[in-house]
């Protein structure tokens, strides 16, 4: 029994390539015939004549060998071509009976149900918005939906049968006003197969771009389809939602949301699509990115991440906010990052919030700086799992002449835990070139048993005239047991940002969170340290954050220590920052009924 598999098309192409190689070698040998076999002597002496005769003899010998090789090559190509033709003829002869057999198998279901038993569905005709045909009941992919005529929605993709992928949705038609929506992706196979991608929205020439089509859902096993991109327009169209992953799928996530459409001339970029949910056990899909804003348009908001599976699964990451560009005198505004998706009911982490979009400064002299988008909120954790981290704030760029600074976006808040788990960390504030940097996000609250999330660090002020962002407050351990989250550090800048306060501990047990350190000040005072968090009934108060240093001005004040409650020591005060005059140290926290007071910070 032979296990050899041949591809006739590949063999035919190889035979053609071999023939071309032979022709090329033959032309090269013919061109070399005269120069190599008819050499002239360099002089009239006998030595020159002997040398010329020797090299001419070598050339003639080479031509003789080349002639034999050419004959062998021609015979080999002829044999190879005949073999390729034999394979092609055999395949054609074998395919005809099989096609007839397939038609016999498919005819009953085609007549009764309007779809074959085995085979792919037909694609919808372009420009009609026709739906893609359904795939075979047993095996086959759904057909792609046809694109829409001007102003007409794209056709939905065809559904698969038991095994196969759903067809992609058709593109929405362009419109003189609003663009038409893209078609939805077809459903994946009932047993196995991924959902089809949603079609992109059409262009809205004077209005809003078309909505992206939603991705198709999977059956029992498979990934959800990706949402279609929103169409461009004065306002960009929203991206389509991602499809749900298979009900029992473990590895593949829900489909990602589609990207929001581009916006022009003062509109707003489209919002990214929501990520698809997990089935019972898989992760949610990522949210789509917000649309880009051009010529004074704001960037679109990122899409929300999809929720994790019903029983277990992590939430999807929120989409990144779109970039906003300025017009001649007004800076652009970045879109907000999308919220992270929530985890499943039993196990899983909340999704990370999306990063805020960048705000670009105005291109003309005298214009304003851009404004970065706010970072997305972290998703909530499951009963057993942490909350998601907040997204980073967007960057605020200065104007083209560097006279006006941008504003950095605030970091997103961390997601909350539920039963057992820590709160998510707050996102870092966005940086700014010559303006105010964004503040850090607040840490998420812990579960019934779990620590609060750390506060996000304040953004950095990069050049003179900038203000460092304040650190975010640490999250509280809102349940029975757990430590408070540490406060975020204040950002660096000409004027420094203050550190965030530490979070409070759980009711029964836990230490208070430490306060965040103040930022470094270049021309202004150093930032003040954050206050330490309060302890639980058993636990120590959090230490105060150190005051920030200053290059030419006063050091920042240290944060006060947190108080203990019943059994525990008070937190130590933070040290004052170094500067032309040192900052004052923070006061120590008070002890519980059993414990010691915290030490004051050094000045």
UniProtKB/Swiss-Prot annotation:
SUPFAM superfamilies: PE/PPE dimer-like (SSF140459). The keyword Repeat applies. Keywords: Repeat. Residues 1-93 form the PE domain. Signal peptide: none annotated. The keyword Transmembrane helix does not apply. It holds the Pfam family PE. Gene3D superfamilies: HP0062-like domain (1.10.287.850). Belongs to the mycobacterial PE family. PGRS subfamily. This is Uncharacterized PE-PGRS family protein PE_PGRS24. It comes from Mycobacterium tuberculosis (strain ATCC 25618 / H37Rv).
């Amino acid at each position: 029994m032979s296990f050899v598999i041949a591809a006739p098309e590949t063999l035919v192409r190889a035979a053609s390539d071999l023939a071309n190689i032979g022709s090329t070698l033959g032309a090269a040998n013919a061109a070399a015939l005269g120069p190599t076999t008819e050499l002239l002597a360099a002089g009239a002496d006998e030595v020159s004549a002997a040398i010329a005769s020797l090299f001419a003899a070598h050339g003639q010998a080479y031509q003789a060998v080349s002639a034999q090789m050419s004959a062998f090559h021609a015979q080999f190509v002829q044999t190879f071509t005949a073999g390729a033709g034999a394979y092609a003829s055999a395949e054609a002869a074998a395919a005809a009976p099989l096609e007839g057999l397939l038609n016999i198998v498919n005819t009953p279901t085609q007549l009764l149900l309007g779809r074959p038993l085995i085979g792919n569905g037909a694609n919808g005709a372009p420009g009609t918005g026709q739906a893609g045909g359904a795939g075979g009941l047993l095996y086959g992919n759904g057909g792609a939906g046809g694109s829409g005529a001007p102003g007409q929605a794209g056709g939905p993709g065809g559904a698969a049968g038991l095994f196969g992928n759903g067809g992609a949705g058709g593109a929405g038609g362009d419109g003189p006003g609003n663009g038409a929506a893209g078609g939805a992706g077809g459903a994946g196979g009932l047993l196995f197969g991924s959902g089809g991608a949603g079609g992109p929205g059409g262009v809205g020439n004077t209005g809003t771009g078309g909505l992206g089509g939603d991705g198709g859902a999977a059956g029992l096993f498979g990934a959800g389809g990706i949402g279609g991109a929103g169409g461009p327009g004065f306002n960009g169209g929203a991206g389509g939602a991602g499809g749900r992953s298979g009900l029992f799928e473990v590895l593949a996530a829900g489909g990602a949301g589609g990207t929001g459409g581009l916006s022009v001339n003062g509109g707003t970029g489209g919002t990214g699509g929501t990520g698809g949910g997990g089935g019972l056990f898989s992760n949610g899909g990522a949210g789509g990115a917000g649309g880009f804003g051009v010529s004074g348009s704001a960037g679109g908001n990122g899409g929300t991440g999809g929720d994790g599976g019903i029983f277990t699964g992590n939430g999807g990451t929120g989409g990144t906010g779109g970039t906003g560009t300025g017009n001649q005198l007004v800076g652009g505004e970045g879109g907000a990052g999308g919220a992270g998706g929530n985890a499943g009911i039993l196990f899983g982490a909340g999704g990370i919030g999306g990063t805020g979009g960048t705000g670009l400064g105005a291109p003309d002299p005298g214009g304003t700086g851009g404004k970065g988008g706010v970072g997305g909120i972290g998703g909530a954790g499951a009963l057993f799992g942490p909350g998601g981290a907040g997204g980073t704030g967007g960057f605020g760029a200065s104007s083209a002449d560097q006279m006006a600074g941008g504003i950095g976006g605030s970091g997103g808040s961390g997601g909350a835990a539920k039963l057992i788990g820590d709160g998510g960390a707050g996102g870092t504030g966005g940086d700014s070139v010559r303006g105010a940097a964004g503040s850090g996000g607040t840490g998420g609250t812990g579960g019934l048993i779990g620590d609060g999330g750390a506060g996000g660090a304040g953004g950095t002020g990069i050049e003179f005239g900038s203000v460092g962002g304040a650190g975010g407050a640490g999250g509280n351990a809102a349940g029975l047991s757990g430590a408070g989250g540490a406060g975020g550090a204040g950002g660096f800048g000409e004027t420094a940002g203050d550190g965030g306060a530490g979070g409070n501990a759980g009711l029964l047990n836990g230490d208070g969170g430490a306060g965040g350190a103040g930022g470094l000040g270049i021309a202004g005072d150093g930032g003040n340290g954050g206050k330490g968090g309060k302890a639980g009934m058993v636990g120590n108060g959090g230490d105060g954050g150190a005051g920030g240093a200053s290059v030419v001005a006063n050091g920042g004040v240290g944060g006060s220590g947190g108080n203990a409650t019943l059994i525990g020591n008070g937190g130590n005060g933070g040290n004052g920052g170094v500067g032309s005059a040192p900052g004052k140290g923070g006061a120590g926290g008070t002890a519980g009924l059993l414990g010691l007071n915290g030490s004051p910070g050094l000045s």
